[in-house]
Design a protein with these regions (language model features):
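Non-transmembrane "mature" sequence context
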Residues: 1-153
Length: 153
């Protein structure tokens, strides 16, 4: 008797990883349990300045993007750590910037300009202003994907 393997069963192939070029200089893992643990514990405050510097934006811009008031930012600096929600928003901001870098072929200045510019595909909002919620962040990821594929927005 012959055993047939179903042709509809496919071998698992892991999805594309987020490139390391932005994560490594920041000292953050791009995925996996280390990243999950860091977010749950709260990112150390030192990552805030690294992220702002790497994204070529001022601290106030990053603070506003992740919905942290100046008063709360000073509290986080004293505590030395962000909470889970703020950490998640910071990591989402890095991931969006990574995709913008890919869109602009690693031109950091162009990606930073795009992140700071009003965009028709986002209802004339800036991508940096769309980091408050997962839905808004997903809209930015979706827009980058459409632009990469040449879909008019």
């Amino acid at each position: 008797m012959e055993v047939k393997v179903l042709s509809s069963i496919k071998e698992y192939q892991p999805g594309p990883q987020i490139p390391q070029r932005i994560w490594m200089p920041l000292g953050l893992p791009s995925r996996g349990t280390r990243l999950h643990d860091l977010i749950c514990e709260g990112l150390p405050f030192e990552f805030f300045d690294r992220i702002a510097s790497h994204l070529h934006v001022q601290r106030e811009v990053v603070s506003k993007a992740i919905c942290v008031s100046p008063t709360m930012l000073s509290r986080r600096a004293k505590a030395g750590r962000f909470n889970t929600v703020e950490s998640d928003r910071l990591v989402a901001l890095v991931a969006v910037f990574e995709n913008a870098l890919y869109l602009f072929e690693n031109d950091v200045a162009a990606a930073a300009r795009w992140m700071n510019s009003s965009n028709r595909g986002l209802g004339w909002n800036r991508p940096l202003d769309m980091m408050r919620t997962r839905v808004e962040t997903k809209a930015v990821f979706d827009l980058i994907g459409r632009l990469e594929r040449g879909v008019l927005v």
